């Protein structure tokens, strides 16, 4: 087996298959496993996907939400075992792959149209 095929085989075995399909503009609920000392708990982070990047094992996505009037963005590796599950709450209709313009918008201007 050549090096390239070996890397490809190892990479393929690490990919998760239980994740839903989602795109930028969708509203997600990401259930993240957090370990604090000896305790382990699940934290839910709900917001709009503003970007996806990479491919294979190194693929990441960024979710943005407004918490107490402050914008919070969190980037997650897609295939990490720390993500318990991902729920798609709404499908958004956008015409961009990267929604960085949402950072400067507030209130109703930051709404994303829902796909029917």
UniProtKB/Swiss-Prot annotation:
Signal peptide: none annotated. One of its GO terms (biological process) is translation. Coiled coil: none annotated. One of its GO terms (molecular function) is structural constituent of ribosome. PANTHER family: LARGE RIBOSOMAL SUBUNIT PROTEIN BL19M (PTHR15680:SF9), RIBOSOMAL PROTEIN L19 (PTHR15680). This protein is located at the 30S-50S ribosomal subunit interface and may play a role in the structure and function of the aminoacyl-tRNA binding site. Belongs to the bacterial ribosomal protein bL19 family. This is Large ribosomal subunit protein bL19. The lineage of its organism: Bacteria, Bacillati, Bacillota, Bacilli, Bacillales. The gene is rplS.
């Amino acid at each position: 087996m050549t090096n390239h095929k070996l890397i490809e085989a190892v990479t393929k075995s690490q990919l998760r298959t239980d994740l839903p399909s989602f795109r930028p503009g969708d509203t997600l609920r990401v259930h993240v496993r957090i370990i604090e000392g000896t305790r382990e708990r699940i934290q839910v982070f709900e917001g709009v996907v503003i970007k996806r990047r990479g491919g294979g094992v190194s693929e990441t996505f960024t979710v943005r939400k407004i918490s107490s009037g402050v914008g919070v963005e969190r980037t997650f590796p897609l295939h990490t075992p720390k993500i318990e599950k991902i729920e798609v709450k709404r499908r958004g209709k956008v015409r961009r792959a990267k929604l960085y313009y949402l950072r400067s918008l507030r209130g109703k201007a930051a709404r994303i149209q829902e796909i029917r």
